[in-house]
């Protein structure tokens, strides 16, 4: 039995893009079952240098690095709640996503907050998570990952193996590759920002000519830099290239950075 969990953004769920696409290509012999669990499943994220200490306080399962490696998942308990714990997160720190039946959410949250008092636990929201994910160049469905861009443009090259056999979209993707791509996803440091950072859809310039647009941005407090992700023309996507970005009608200098400027080697995630 193969079980697949798909956690989509609000936009994709609302527009039913994932839902309709999966149903379109599902086999009709009953070998695959598709069920929307949006209203019955919740997710809480535990992340930070003391995440393992906290999880060991609320669960009888072993969260050691040897027993629970990065990019793996296990069924565990948190208090009285059954949880599908995944050692991944969207903030770039040691941590776990805790997927659970929604009726256990308050119990899990209270358990984590009570056990984490002496560890300095604090709740954080989606805007904080957005800032943290940008420091890692993590891509968001609906912005950096969308039907508007090819997976090559969005920096998903390592997940594409066109020589391993046919798959849905391969023919169209090969034609796209032959034609050439119009965009490349880059991470930018925006210099000398004042009271506003890139929010998204900001035009990107090179010598007064529009060469792309920002898909998102925030101030990165771990890096102490204003960070943005942007789709730009490939000729201007090299590390070190100097560009300009429009924020509320004012131009700011920006530099193309190497991907994942915070903890590039993922040492914290692997800790």
What are the language-model segments listed below?
Residues 16-18, 52-55, 104-111, 196-199, ...:
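Short, conserved charged micro-motifs
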Residues 8-10, 96-98, 225-232:
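A generic structural motif
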Residues 9, 47, 189:
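Short beta-strand segments
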Residues 15-17, 93-94, 105-107, 133, ...:
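Flexible loop/turn segments at secondary-structure boundaries
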Residues 1-13:
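Single conserved hydrophobic/aromatic residue that forms the stacking wall/gate
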Residues 149, 153-271:
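Glycine-rich, small/acidic residue-mixed loop/short-helix segments
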Residues 26, 31-177, 181:
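Glycine-rich, acidic
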